[in-house]
Amino acid sequence: MHVMIAWGKLRLGAWDQYEHFYKERVAVTTKGIKGLRERQLLRSTEDPDEGITVSMWNSLEDLLNYERSELRQTLAKEAEHLYRGEFWVKHFEVRDHGR
């Protein structure tokens, strides 16, 4: 399993708008994409304008196919006005499920 983590700082006070975008656009349009196992939105308890999205994928190939897709590019472009310039995306391989 592979994980894509996107971290970012939003414009001050933009969290509610971002959360609405995430639930109405990201979660809805990516549901059923090949290889996507789960998706989560996390909000910092220390900074209300900081968040992380975590998506879990069956394979690195599935993750990369999504990341390079037109859909992913469109969603990123639609959300970019909510960020204040601090943003990164990283990929990880799950080495231990802890189960």
Task: Tell me what each language-model feature is.
Residues 1-51, 56-70, 83-99:
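Short S/T/G/P-rich N-terminal loop/turn motif that feeds into the first structured element of a domain
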